C-alpha cells in the first residue's frame, strides 16, 4: 500500500491542479473527475484511468473503497492523499475523497452509426459546461446514441461538465462537428432527420410525429439556434409554456423532446 501524500508539492497533486486549465487538458488529453459517481462511472465504462486519487479518511462509502482497491490490484495507479490536502484540492464542499485522472475519448463524427431506432443529440455552441454536462446525463438517461458538439462549444471534459453529467460523459460517445455545415452534411449522408425546437413552430412536441432515425439539435439558452439552422431542420416543434415562465433550461427542454420520442417509439412497438 502506498504512503499517504500530505505535500502539495507531490507531482500528482500538481497535475490535479494543472488540469483545471482547458488548454492543458486539451494538450495532454486527460481530465480530472471528482466524486464517487463520476469516478465509478469512469471505471465501470472502461475509460482510460491514469490514476485514482482518494483520501482514506474522507472516503466513507465502502463499495467505493473496494472499487479502488480492486482497481489497484488490477494494476491501476492509486494515490492516497490526506483528507486535509484533498479538501484543499477539491472544488466542492464536503468532498467525498475520491477523484481520478482520466483520458479523454472523442469519437470521430464519421464513425457514429445511424441505425433504425437511433436518436442523437446535437448541441450548437453551448457555452456553459454545467448545461453541457446535464444534457449529456439526460441523453444517457433517454438512451441517445451519442452527443454531437457543433461549433465553439464548452469543453465536455471541464470538471463542471463531468460533475453535471454524473459521469455519463464516460459512457455516452461525444463527437464534434466544426460547424453547422459539417453537422448537416453528416446528417444528410445518413438520412437523419434533424429535429429542432422553436416557440414559432406550428406543432407542439406532443403533436409531432417523429421520423426515424433522428437527431435533436438544440441551441444555447440565450440566442438559441440560428435561423439558418432552424430552416435546415426537417421538423420543428414547440414546447408549450402554460405558466409564467417564457422558456425552459436547456437540459429540461432536451429531456422533454427526447422522452416524447421514446414514448412514441414505445407506443409503435419500436422499443
Regions found by a protein language model. Name each.
Residues 1-91:
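N-terminal positively charged helical leader segments and presequences
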Residues 5, 31, 124-125, 150-151, ...:
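Glycine- and other small-residue-rich loops at beta-strand/loop junctions that grip anionic moieties
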Residues 22-23, 113-121, 232-241:
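Glycine/charged-rich beta-loop-alpha catalytic/anionic-binding loops adjacent to active sites
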Residues 37, 44, 70-73, 79, ...:
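RNA substrate-binding interface of SAM-dependent RNA methyltransferases
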Residues 100, 138-142, 156-169, 227-271:
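Structured adenosyl-cofactor binding patch, chiefly the S-adenosyl-L-methionine
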Residues 195-245, 249:
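Active-site/ligand-binding-proximal alpha/beta "capping" segment
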Amino acid at each position: 500500500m502506498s504512503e499517504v501524500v500530505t505535500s502539495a508539492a507531490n507531482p500528482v497533486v500538481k497535475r490535479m491542479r494543472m488540469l483545471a486549465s482547458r488548454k492543458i487538458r486539451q494538450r495532454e488529453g486527460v481530465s480530472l473527475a471528482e466524486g464517487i459517481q463520476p469516478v465509478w462511472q469512469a471505471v465501470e465504462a472502461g475509460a482510460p484511468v491514469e490514476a485514482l486519487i482518494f483520501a482514506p479518511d474522507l472516503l466513507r462509502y465502502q463499495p467505493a473503497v473496494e472499487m479502488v482497491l480492486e482497481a489497484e490490484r488490477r494494476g491501476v495507479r492509486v494515490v492516497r492523499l490526506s483528507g486535509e490536502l484533498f479538501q484543499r484540492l477539491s472544488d466542492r464542499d464536503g468532498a467525498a475523497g475520491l477523484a481520478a485522472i482520466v483520458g479523454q475519448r472523442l469519437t470521430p463524427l464519421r464513425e457514429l452509426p445511424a441505425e433504425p431506432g437511433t436518436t442523437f443529440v446535437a448541441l450548437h455552441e453551448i457555452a456553459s459546461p454545467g448545461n453541457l454536462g446535464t444534457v449529456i446525463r439526460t441523453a444517457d438517461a433517454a438512451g441517445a446514441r451519442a452527443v454531437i458538439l457543433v461549433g465553439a462549444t464548452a469543453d465536455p471534459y471541464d470538471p463542471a461538465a463531468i460533475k453535471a453529467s454524473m459521469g455519463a460523459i464516460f459512457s455516452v460517445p461525444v463527437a464534434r462537428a466544426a460547424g453547422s455545415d459539417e453537422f448537416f452534411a453528416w446528417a444528410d449522408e445518413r438520412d437523419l432527420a434533424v429535429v429542432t425546437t422553436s416557440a414559432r413552430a406550428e406543432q407542439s412536441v406532443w403533436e409531432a410525429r417523429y421520423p426515424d432515425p433522428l437527431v435533436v439539435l438544440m441551441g444555447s439558452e440565450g440566442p438559441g439556434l440560428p435561423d439558418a439552422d432552424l430552416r435546415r431542420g426537417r421538423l420543428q416543434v414547440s414546447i408549450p409554456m402554460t405558466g409564467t415562465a417564457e422558456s425552459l433550461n436547456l437540459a429540461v427542454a432536451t429531456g422533454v423532446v427526447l422522452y416524447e420520442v421514446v414514448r412514441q417509439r414505445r407506443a409503435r412497438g419500436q422499443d
